[in-house]
C-alpha cells in the first residue's frame, strides 16, 4: 500500500512538472494561437476575472496564483509572456485532463477572457513591486 501511495505521489509531481513546463502548448491548433483577448488591460475585466478565478481556479492554483503542491504557478514566464492569449483561451476551453486541467468551457467566452485578463494582470502587478 505504501508503494502505491509513493507511486501516486511521484505521478502527481511529474504531472505538475510537465504542466509547469508548458507541454500543453504543443496541443494548441494553429488557428487558435492568434486569438486576441477583447478584455485585455480593462480594469473591470481584471476585477471580474479575479472573482471567476477565485471561484473556479484558486482551489488548484492558489489564491494568489502562485501554485500549490499539486498544481503549477500561473505567474511563470511561460504563462505570463510565452503563451499567447489564444493559447491560454484554448487551454481553458479544452482543458488538458491528462495533466489534471479540466475544461472550463461551461463558463463561456466572456468569463474565460476575464480570467485570462486577471492572470495576465498578475505579471504587471509583480513587475511594479
Give the positions of each predicted feature.
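Short, small-residue-rich loop/turn micro-motifs
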Residues: 29, 64, 92, 96
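Electrostatic cytochrome c docking/interface patches
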Residues: 22-52
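Axial heme c-ligation environment in periplasmic c-type cytochrome domains
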Residues: 17-21, 39, 68-76, 93-129
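The canonical Cys-X-X-Cys-His
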Residues: 49, 53-63, 115-119
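Gly/Gly-Pro-rich "capping" loops immediately C-terminal to redox-active cysteine motifs
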Residues: 39-50, 66-93
